């Protein structure tokens, strides 16, 4: 309880779309019909109020079944969002609802801050559009400018030195860059050098045979 008492409590009139960590004390005026989600959860939309006005709050599952009109409740760590054009309170994952009393509270039903407000809906749509445009425009310009030039220049230059290097390093005679048939000459050279060596050395045995 000490942590809750130290947290600042705001009025319903100060709630804005996108607000988080809201701490509000209100009285329950009405409890709406129960609707079920696809996952089997029960959702109740309740109308609550304080001295500054009224607002709708969406309560899920067991908490909604325990709330009764006239209960004074403290909302902790709630948040606000626009649903179907209406400002609505939610408990959130870390939020909590605690009953602190009954009936004895000064409140005002007017103004109803959950009435459909086209201005709030338009502002939310504009914020979403601007954020998407800022995210969508910046990356393609950078990628298009940086990606085209270096890719083509590097690909054209790379294959030129690779072909002569692989052809020259394969055999010792490949250092002559302009010879088209180095493999043929390399394959034919081993036969002639052997008889040349034998012929040069064969002069002595011929003279010996004549003698």
UniProtKB/Swiss-Prot annotation:
Signal peptide: none annotated. Keywords: DNA damage, DNA repair, DNA-binding, Nucleus. Residues 136-157 have a biased composition (Polar residues). Its main location: nucleus. CDD domains: SoSSB_OBF (cd04491). Residues 179-195 have a biased composition (Pro residues). Transmembrane segments: none annotated. Residues 27-97 bind DNA. One of its GO terms (molecular function) is single-stranded DNA binding. It is found in: Nucleus. Component of the SOSS complex, a multiprotein complex that functions downstream of the MRN complex to promote DNA repair and G2/M checkpoint. In the SOSS complex, acts as a sensor of single-stranded DNA that binds to single-stranded DNA. The SOSS complex associates with DNA lesions and influences diverse endpoints in the cellular DNA damage response including cell-cycle checkpoint activation, recombinational repair and maintenance of genomic stability. Required for efficient homologous recombination-dependent repair of double-strand breaks (DSBs). Belongs to the SOSS-B family. SOSS-B2 subfamily. PANTHER family: OB FOLD NUCLEIC ACID BINDING PROTEIN-RELATED, SOSS COMPLEX SUBUNIT B2. This is SOSS complex subunit B2.
